[in-house]
């Protein structure tokens, strides 16, 4: 698949870790992608709560003022669609990358 280096924090908690309940909640994303990024979305409890568009292939961004949630994750979308083959072959490469979630205590 597309080789994307993606790091995601909420406050001081790295993806896969747990952050203390009680805001403010601040996301930080660092990414190294093979091409420019159409959008960076921050999701909280499955809902998109922040979107940044037209980012370079290598970036570091901070998003302030996230709403309280039970978990957060980051999703990157690069240009291009998902390649579909007329068979049951499922290619690993696509225009997306996701972080692991950051969980909120309690």
Role assignments for model-derived ranges:
Residues 1-106:
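C-terminal functional module detector
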């Amino acid at each position: 698949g597309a080789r994307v280096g993606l790091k995601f924090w909420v406050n001081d908690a790295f993806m896969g870790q747990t952050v203390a309940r009680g805001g403010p909640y601040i996301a930080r994303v660092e990414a190294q992608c093979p091409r420019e990024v159409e959008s960076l979305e921050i999701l909280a409890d499955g809902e998109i709560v922040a979107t940044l568009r037209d980012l370079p292939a290598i970036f570091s961004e901070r998003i302030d003022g996230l709403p309280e949630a039970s978990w957060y994750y980051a999703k990157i979308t690069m240009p291009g669609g998902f390649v579909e083959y007329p068979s049951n072959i499922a290619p690993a490469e696509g225009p997306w990358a996701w972080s692991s979630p950051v969980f909120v205590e309690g």
